[in-house]
Amino acid sequence: VAEVGQKQEVQLQQLDAKSAKGAKFREVKQWQVQQQIPAGNDSKKSKCKCKCQCRVGLRRNLQSCCVFGVGWRDKLVGDMKTKQELLTTEIQHIDIKQHNVVPLVDAMASMAYSSRDLARAASIYEMMLRDTECGVILCLAGSLISAGLQKVIVDLVRNNMVDAIVSTGANIVDQDFFEALGYRHYVAGEEYKYGAGDAELRELMIDRIYDTFIDEEELRVCDDTTKQITDSLEPRAYSSREFIQEMGKWLKDNKRTPEHGEHDSIVLACYEKDVPIFCPAFSDCSAGFGLVAHQHERRGKAVVSIDSAKDFYEITQLKIANPTTGLLMIGGGVPKNFAQDIVVAADILGVEASMHKYAIQITVADARDGALSGSTLKEASSWGKVDLTYEQMVFAEATMAFPLIAGYAFHKDAQAARTEKRFAQVLLEPVAV
């Protein structure tokens, strides 16, 4: 025990005794001496040989280590919560069907600033839906599904209030498909919102999205599932729309298995309603990891790949087939520009397409840096993309504004006369130009 104690003391002298971690580590080391546990090698190359395969020392977490002894981690973290304790309170998806916001939004129309803008945007969305010739394109950027907006979008799809979706890959794969597998996003404590504890979260394999937690180990399952889907496909170039349709088919075939259960999903709802989903930057998400692994394993052989130009051509076909269009844009980025540009793309293909008749954007981005996300819809009109008669910018955070706009149109029954456009079927046969 004395020899072990001397080794531990050498390590302790290398720590900052004034730091909280140093003090806690000292306490653990002293506890090891009392338990007659030999000192471990804390080098990066050293690994525990127990089932957890964690790195010795503080470098990798999990439950116990054969070098430090069962219970060492609980002793080390002290007041720090375990992974199970942190991933407890689930993010809840708001249900617009349960909240009639019409009186509230109507009252906001008589106010000023963003309240009035939001009320006007809600009225434009209502008009967009009552125009049964209008093809409604929903654009999604930012981390929306993890924030509790999944059910809003699912309800819009199921009630014919959205005819096509353009999104970032994260919303569709890392968040929606992830939850369709039976996993969840969790509420983070206020102390974590601004970065306190991020190092500990990394040790626990918990990823943070501002005030929301996601289990990295579960994300790896999502990555692997997309690889399984990729491996099952005929090797060729796919549009992201085609690939996501295969994901929807996979959910349809597997959703009732015990490991997946019954869960809402945008991918599944769109598959069932033939609502196409486009992710122009599709590799920038969990699907990208699956595609990379697939192509790495098949070096020198035919592989599955994603063709973003095919995406652009397909969504332009929708504009040609359905000339009257409206945009409901949450955030900006690639989805916003991609959807706006189909007017110009149709013109390049020799079709005189009208500008988007309706356009709404919810954003907190600033127009003054010249970036796309904050560029106004009036600016887009100078490019020949958006008509100015029915357009509205709403400078507000999406989790507050989007449910109000969507809920307003839903409870006004604006979708009553709409029928399924099933745009995914249109893409089976390219439109003649």
Where do the protein language model's features map onto the residues?
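Glycine-rich anion-binding loop/nest that anchors nucleotide
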Residues: 136-145, 165, 278-282, 300-372
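A generic, well-ordered mixed alpha/beta core segment in the N-terminal half of proteins
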Residues: 153-221
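Short, low-complexity, charge-dense intrinsically disordered segments
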Residues: 2-3, 15-27, 41-44, 49-53, ...
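C-terminal functional extensions of proteins
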Residues: 82, 86, 324, 348-433
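Glycine-rich phosphate/diphosphate-binding loops that line cofactor/substrate pockets in enzymes
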Residues: 122-135, 269-271, 317-324
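Ligand-binding beta-strand-loop-alpha-helix segment within the catalytic cores
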Residues: 197-287
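N-terminal glycine-rich anion-binding loop in soluble enzyme alpha/beta folds
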Residues: 80-122, 128
